[in-house]
Amino acid sequence: PIAGSMILAAILLKLGGYGIIRLMQIFPTTKTDVFLPFIVLALWGAILANLTCLQQTDLKSLIAYSSISHMGLVVAAIIIQTPWGLSGAMALMIAHGFTSSALFCLANTTYERTHTRILILTRGLHNMMPMATTWWLMANLMNIAIPPSMNFTGELLILSTLFNWCPTTIIMLGLSMLITASYSLHMFLSTQMGPTLINNLTEPTHSREHLLMTLHLIPLLMISFKPELVT
């Protein structure tokens, strides 16, 4: 069920990150070299999850793997145990919680009308649901972490933290962000652009769906422009 996916991606997955933050308090902050294998594993896991997103044909699976890839960056930033790293991890967890939940909501909106989650079968929806296409564009831009979104702030803090710790990590981080932009663009173009493959008429988006997306993106934009609301 889509409600379970939204709660899992927005809350339960982030509780794991919060648990790691609490657990790291019992370890000395000066021995980050001890955690080198875990940091490399977290970054490598983020890249593998992003590569898995590129080969997904199921819309829901693509969004789920996207959430996992972002948590790899969060875990790497937490393990380094610096103020910037913790701030970036918290910012990215909050921002991506809203973003992934919004994407799952949009995926369900598409599924209710097409009865399929296969990307190639849901193309051309901008002809039938132009307002939903706007929501898709905003959610994907947040997923890519464009400035001045909270996603961008979190990823920038994480990037700075990992680069100061080891400049070589910029290669893995840059590759991860490049793949994230690639599959986000692929997801948007596959579901919204191109010729319509659905023969029957679909009903337009309802007010409840617009309200649901507004309740996802308005708090995210408020936090992006006024981050002291959560600090």
From Swiss-Prot:
Protein task: Core subunit of the mitochondrial membrane respiratory chain NADH dehydrogenase (Complex I) that is believed to belong to the minimal assembly required for catalysis. Complex I functions in the transfer of electrons from NADH to the respiratory chain. The immediate electron acceptor for the enzyme is believed to be ubiquinone.
Principal location listed in the UniProt entry: mitochondrion
Family, similarity comment: Belongs to the complex I subunit 4 family.
Family matches, as PANTHER family: NADH-UBIQUINONE OXIDOREDUCTASE CHAIN 4
Bilayer topology term: Multi-pass membrane protein
Protein name as annotated: NADH-ubiquinone oxidoreductase chain 4
Coiled-coil blocks: none
Alphabetized UniProt keyword annotations: Electron transport, Membrane, Mitochondrion, NAD, Respiratory chain, Translocase, Transmembrane, Transmembrane helix, Transport, Ubiquinone
Transmembrane annotation, as ranges: 1-21, 34-54, 63-85, 89-111, 128-148, 169-189, 211-231
Reaction equation(s) it catalyzes: a ubiquinone + NADH + 5 H(+)(in) = a ubiquinol + NAD(+) + 4 H(+)(out)
Any one GO molecular-function label of the UniProt entry: NADH dehydrogenase (ubiquinone) activity
EC number: 7.1.1.2
UniProt xrefs under InterPro entries: NADH_UbQ_OxRdtase (IPR003918), ND/Mrp_TM (IPR001750)
GO CC field: mitochondrial membrane
Gene transcribed to yield this protein: MT-ND4
GO biological process, one term: electron transport coupled proton transport
Localization per Swiss-Prot or TrEMBL: Mitochondrion membrane
